[in-house]
């Protein structure tokens, strides 16, 4: 039965409990939280455009749009060629590849390599978002859907904002390039940890 008079905080707690007890959901949402938290190179794009790649406003615009271009491409590709098997494993590989792209972007001194790395990061991030969103829908029963989607939104929104904060703090402490390399490396480390700690997510297929 649907409870209509439940207090908001109780609903949130129930959603968190369900996510925590469903390992595929916990793995998928944690993967997104920490990958975005550590892989937030987008916040540093203005610095890379001006001080490292030495490109003007047009170059900055292309760099800023690169990840979105990649995301649009993968949406079009998956519409034509759906992901048919091994989705959990492919999700982890995509997030790991995203971390590698962030490292390549950090180390590149050539505009087109930086641009290509960001486009590919957008493709991989878009792929992981599609697969992760499908897993969340499939593993959530109808009576829990609103609560779990609220938790999902909380994870996404908090990781985006905290990721930009982490990027700024890390850049201040380490320098811009080392901080972005650190973020990409931590993203890969999160993937390795999830690979072994969440086997049910790794083996997930739909």
Where are these regions (language model features)?
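C-terminal transmembrane bundle of multi-pass solute transporters/carriers
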Residues: 13, 20, 28, 45-206
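Hydrophobic alpha-helical transmembrane segments of multi-pass membrane transport/permease proteins
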Residues: 30-36
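Transmembrane-helix terminus/interface motifs of multi-pass secondary transporters
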Residues: 37-47
């Amino acid at each position: 039965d649907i409870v209509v008079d439940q207090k908001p905080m109780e609903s949130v707690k129930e959603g968190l409990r369900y996510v925590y007890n469903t390992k595929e959901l916990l793995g998928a949402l944690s993967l997104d939280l920490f990958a975005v938290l550590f892989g937030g190179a987008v916040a540093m794009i203005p610095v890379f455009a001006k001080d490292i790649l030495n490109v003007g406003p047009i170059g900055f615009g292309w760099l800023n749009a690169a990840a979105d271009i990649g995301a649009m491409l993968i949406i079009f590709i998956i519409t034509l060629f759906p992901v048919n098997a091994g989705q959990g494993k492919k999700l982890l590989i995509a997030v790991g590849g995203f971390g590698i792209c962030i490292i390549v972007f950090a180390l590149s001194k050539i505009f087109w390599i930086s641009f290509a790395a960001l486009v590919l990061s957008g493709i991989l991030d878009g792929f992981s978002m599609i697969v992760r969103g499908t897993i969340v829908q499939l593993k959530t029963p109808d009576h829990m859907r609103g609560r779990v989607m609220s938790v999902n939104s909380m994870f996404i929104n908090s990781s985006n904002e905290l990721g930009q904060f982490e990027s700024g703090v890390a850049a201040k402490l380490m320098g811009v390039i080392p901080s972005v390399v650190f973020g990409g490396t931590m993203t890969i480390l999160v993937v390795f940890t999830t690979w072994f700690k969440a086997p049910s997510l790794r083996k997930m297929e739909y």
